[in-house]
């Protein structure tokens, strides 16, 4: 299994990956002919940020201690980072002292009741390790038979990368895989010493070449909202949208609710599945 600090993306690795994605033209620099590597050179990033090249090199080599907020904000602008990518940069560069090393594994009974009380659309609670902690009957009917799975198997990253039927269940597998890796990257930045996260990423790295390839991109993703498709053996493909809500008073527990457009085939499919779950 990889070492913890290898699994949690280092600041240097993240900076190198991100500057390779930004062309000189993207930041208004003149072309300089053929380049050996894609993206910006170290000295170009340093110039954009207002740093010496030596200091920026020390940042990429992990030899600069806790860069200031001003430096990190300037790096985020120069590398054109999104809000999630900027947050990840801060996590890597300025780890919070005393931060919890693991994610809560239990759901408050009242939160579990909230999920169960959602009658007509799939809903679940997951953490940023992708552990599914609570679900309603429609989520179990559509996504996976969570009650029949062992606790460690109730993890969407394992379902995506290690389940041989994953591409059948998830018609949008490529996007689902990329966003799942992005969530794990953000979690690793927040909690590089979380033992369960270390074990999970090690297991996925050993078991899935696709995961290893995506992990090497340093892509980060914060689950918020968007389209999601599932394929069910009885009702076929179901096109939904999801919205994500941070569960109050918990560490990185998310309520995810999937909804169908009114009058759509997906709504009819969910209605039929709901009838089956009550039969």
Language-model region placement:
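Recognition helix of helix-turn-helix/homeodomain-like DNA-binding domains
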Residues: 32-36, 42-43, 49-66, 74-76
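Amphipathic, well-packed alpha-helical segments that form the structural scaffold of globular domains
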Residues: 16-23, 90, 94, 116, ...
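An N-terminal domain-cap segment
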Residues: 26-39, 99-110, 116-117
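Short amphipathic recognition helices of helix-turn-helix/homeodomain-type DNA-binding modules
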Residues: 1-16, 67-110, 128
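Hydrophobic protein-protein interaction segments
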Residues: 109-127, 132-279
């Amino acid at each position: 299994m990889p070492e913890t600090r290898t699994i949690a993306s280092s600041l240097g690795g993240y900076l190198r990956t991100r500057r390779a994605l930004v062309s000189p033209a993207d930041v208004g620099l003149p072309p300089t002919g053929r380049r050996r590597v894609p993206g910006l050179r170290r000295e170009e990033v340093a110039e954009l940020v207002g740093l010496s090249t030596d200091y920026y090199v020390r940042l990429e080599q992990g030899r600069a201690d806790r860069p200031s907020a001003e430096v990190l904000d300037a790096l985020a602008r120069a590398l054109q980072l999104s809000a999630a990518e900027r947050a990840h940069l801060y996590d890597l560069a300025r780890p919070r002292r005393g931060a919890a090393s693991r994610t809560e594994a239990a759901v408050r009974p009242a939160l579990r009741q909230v999920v169960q009380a959602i009658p007509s659309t799939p809903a679940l609670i997951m953490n940023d390790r992708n552990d599914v902690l609570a679900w309603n009957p429609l989520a179990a009917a559509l996504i996976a038979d969570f009650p029949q799975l062992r606790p460690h198997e109730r993890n969407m990253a394992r379902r995506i990368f290690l389940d041989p039927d994953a591409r059948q269940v998830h018609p949008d597998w490529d996007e689902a895989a990329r966003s799942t890796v992005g969530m794990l990257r953000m979690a690793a930045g927040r909690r590089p010493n979380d033992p369960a996260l270390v074990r999970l990423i090690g297991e996925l790295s050993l078991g899935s070449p696709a995961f290893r390839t995506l992990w090497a991109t340093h892509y980060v993703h914060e689950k918020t909202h968007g389209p999601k498709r599932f394929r069910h053996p009885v009702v076929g493909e179901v096109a939904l949208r999801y919205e994500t809500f941070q569960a109050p008073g918990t560490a990185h527990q998310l309520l995810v609710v999937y909804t169908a457009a009114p009058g759509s085939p997906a709504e009819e499919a969910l209605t039929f599945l709901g009838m089956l779950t009550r039969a």
